[in-house]
């Protein structure tokens, strides 16, 4: 739904789907164990770096959006922490975090501006039952978590559908005055395979 919306408006889109299960030719097809989470995170960060270095950064666009769903969002944040030069071109980071997915912080011991930039640039929809909301009942979460919005839903598909109009409105506001094909959007999400 989001990818088609972006393509229909002339965005240049890189849609990355990260499989939860990777099978090898010698595996029995009766059961495929979920890939090691750290290995998946590392591979996703590596792929994001490759795409940034070889495609996105080379483009003339200065309106770049990242959208991450589930664990893939955490991997995008890991990539951004290690590649601070991305901040110059990145206009908005949209994230969707389910109740079972950890929420990555964006804090640096050496860059005091980093968490402020992240708070201003991000919009993260967090599941209604995520542990973060219980932990921060009395005091709002700090800006190291980004600009958070509590979703009315826990199911990822329901969250994506419910927030579609709001997300596309945010992106429309960001692209005021742009030319078609000048706006790469990177969408990374987990898929069950």
Task: Name what the model sees in each region.
Residues 4, 8, 16-62:
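Alpha/beta-hydrolase active-site loop
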Residues 12-17, 65, 92-94:
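Hydrophobic/aromatic beta-strand patches that form the interior of the parallel beta-sheet core
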Residues 13, 59-62, 178-182:
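Short, flexible/disordered secondary-structure transition segments
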Residues 20-21, 71, 99-101:
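Conserved beta-strand elements of beta-rich interaction domains across eukaryotes
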Residues 66-77:
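Gly/Ala-rich beta-loop-alpha elbow adjacent to hydrolase catalytic centers
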Residues 78-82:
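Active-site signature of alpha/beta-hydrolase-fold catalytic machinery across serine-
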Residues 83-192:
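The feature captures the conserved acid-bearing segment of alpha/beta-hydrolase catalytic domains
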């Amino acid at each position: 739904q989001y990818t088609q919306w972006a393509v229909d408006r002339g965005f240049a889109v890189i849609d990355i789907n990260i499989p939860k299960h990777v099978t090898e030719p010698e595996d029995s097809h009766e059961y495929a164990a979920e890939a090691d989470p750290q290995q998946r995170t590392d591979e996703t960060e590596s792929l994001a770096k490759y795409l940034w270095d070889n495609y996105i950064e080379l483009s003339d666009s200065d309106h770049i959006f990242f959208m991450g769903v589930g664990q893939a969002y955490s991997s995008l944040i890991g990539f951004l922490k290690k590649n601070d030069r991305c901040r110059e071109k990145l206009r908005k980071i949209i994230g969707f975090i389910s109740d079972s997915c950890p929420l990555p912080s964006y804090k640096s011991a050496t860059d005091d501006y980093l968490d402020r930039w992240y708070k201003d640039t991000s919009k993260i929809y967090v599941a209604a039952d995520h542990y973060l909301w219980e932990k921060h009942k009395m005091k709002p979460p700090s800006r190291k978590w980004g600009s958070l919005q509590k979703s009315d839903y826990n199911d990822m598909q329901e969250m994506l559908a419910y927030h579609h109009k709001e997300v596309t409105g945010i992106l429309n506001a960001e692209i005021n005055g742009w030319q078609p094909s000048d706006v790469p959007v990177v969408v990374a999400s987990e898929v069950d395979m």
